[in-house]
């Protein structure tokens, strides 16, 4: 049995497959009277949809969303909200030659051993395509959190492959590469083109920031803010590691340098990434995520099939050379979901 529900108060349940008729989500625990239209949801979904840049997958999906329930007079009612997205640009025949093969880096091997019946087309239910549902739900959470608390979620690609990309300005970020350095633009473009030309893929490092989060969000022992953030983010395909604040860099520091000194005006530094004892400090929440190279590559690979026979194969189809570019919008969305869940729980203490 699949576990498809995320969240405690504000919940999301996802359904669908990469090459099925539709993908969709059911959102529960949403407060009433939030203004919400198809356009609000579409704006967010467009940030991650395929086919908008030559540097990502060429699969062209309109990703046109449709809200089925939970809205009346252009506002949320408090009832479950159902949103669907049709799958239009499917090429299932690209997977016929590998339907019995366990692709390295994919979920085929584990899914088959657990369920014995999997949809091999584009990864089926395990496909990153279902992250469009996460982004759909974030249209509600981002809007609610900004309007009521001024909370903002930002991010940028810090590294692609071996290429480190220094941050220059938020104004430089666009959806094609999601980098914040205009000087590195052409270098990154050439690098991705080269990796794509040789049929391989590359990983990425992304920095994420949550701004204006109030003090007191999170819990002291279990259900810490940092543990829930990590849990939500690790539910995104391809993310293999997470760093909060200067957690990794900090192993080189002495305690006298790592400790964030507190003054009457606030903290002098933010090595802890805005979280102490599992609870937000009021500073920016700083997170870094590490994305593995895309598993689907066009280079010949070796594996075994369902019959335990050795095989050599090539993956066809259309895939991202660097999935990290599109994961940015999904990661920002995931952060908004976990913060929404915490905020609603936090407010319940005031009743």
Curated annotation (Swiss-Prot):
Reduced FMN (FMNH(2)). NADP(+) binds at residue 48. The keyword Flavoprotein applies. NCBIfam families: aroC (TIGR00033), PRK05382.1 (NF003793). This reaction introduces a second double bond into the aromatic ring system. It catalyses: 5-O-(1-carboxyvinyl)-3-phosphoshikimate = chorismate + phosphate. The keyword Lyase applies. It is an enzyme of class 4 (lyase). This is Chorismate synthase. InterPro entries: Chorismate_synth, Chorismate_synth_AroC_sf. It comes from Zinderia insecticola (strain CARI). It holds the Pfam family Chorismate_synt. Homotetramer. GO terms for molecular function: chorismate synthase activity; FMN binding. SUPFAM superfamilies: Chorismate synthase, AroC. The gene is aroC. It comes from the Bacteria. PANTHER family: CHORISMATE SYNTHASE. One of its GO terms (cellular component) is cytosol. Keywords: Amino-acid biosynthesis, Aromatic amino acid biosynthesis, FAD, Flavoprotein, FMN, Lyase, NADP. Belongs to the chorismate synthase family. Its cofactor is FMNH2.
């Amino acid at each position: 049995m699949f576990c498809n529900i995320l969240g405690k108060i504000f919940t999301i349940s996802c359904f669908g497959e990469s090459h099925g008729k539709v993908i969709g989500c059911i959102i529960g625990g949403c407060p009433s009277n939030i203004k919400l239209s198809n356009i609000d949801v579409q704006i967010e979904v467009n940030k991650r949809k395929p086919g908008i840049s030559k540097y990502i997958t060429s699969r062209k999906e309109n990703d046109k969303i449709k809200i089925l329930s939970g809205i009346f007079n252009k506002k949320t009612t408090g009832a479950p909200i159902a949103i669907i997205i049709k799958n239009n640009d499917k090429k299932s025949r690209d997977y016929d030659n590998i339907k019995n093969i366990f692709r390295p880096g994919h979920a085929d091997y584990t899914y088959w051993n657990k369920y014995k019946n999997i949809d091999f087309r584009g990864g089926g239910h395990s496909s990153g395509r279902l992250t469009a549902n996460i982004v759909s739900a974030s249209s509600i959470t981002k809007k609610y959190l900004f309007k009521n608390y001024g909370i903002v979620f930002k991010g940028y690609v810090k590294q692609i492959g071996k290429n480190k990309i220094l941050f220059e300005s938020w104004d430089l970020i666009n959806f094609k590469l999601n980098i914040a350095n205009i000087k590195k633009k052409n270098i990154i473009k050439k690098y991705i083109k080269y990796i794509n030309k040789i049929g391989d893929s590359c990983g990425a490092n992304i920095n994420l920031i949550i701004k204006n989060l109030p003090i007191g969000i999170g819990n002291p022992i279990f259900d810490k803010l940092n543990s829930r953030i990590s849990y939500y983010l690790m539910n995104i395909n391809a993310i293999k590691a997470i760093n909060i604040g200067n957690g990794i860099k900090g192993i080189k520091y002495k305690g006298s340098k790592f400790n964030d000194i507190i003054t009457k005006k606030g903290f002098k530094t933010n090595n802890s990434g805005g979280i102490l004892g599992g609870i937000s400090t009021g500073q920016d929440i700083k997170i870094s995520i590490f994305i593995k190279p895309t598993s689907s590559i066009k280079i010949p690979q070796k594996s075994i099939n369902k019959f335990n026979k050795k095989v050599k194969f090539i993956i066809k189809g259309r895939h991202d050379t660097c999935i990290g570019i599109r994961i940015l919008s999904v990661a920002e969305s995931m952060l908004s979901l976990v913060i929404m869940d915490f905020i609603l729980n936090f407010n319940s203490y005031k009743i």
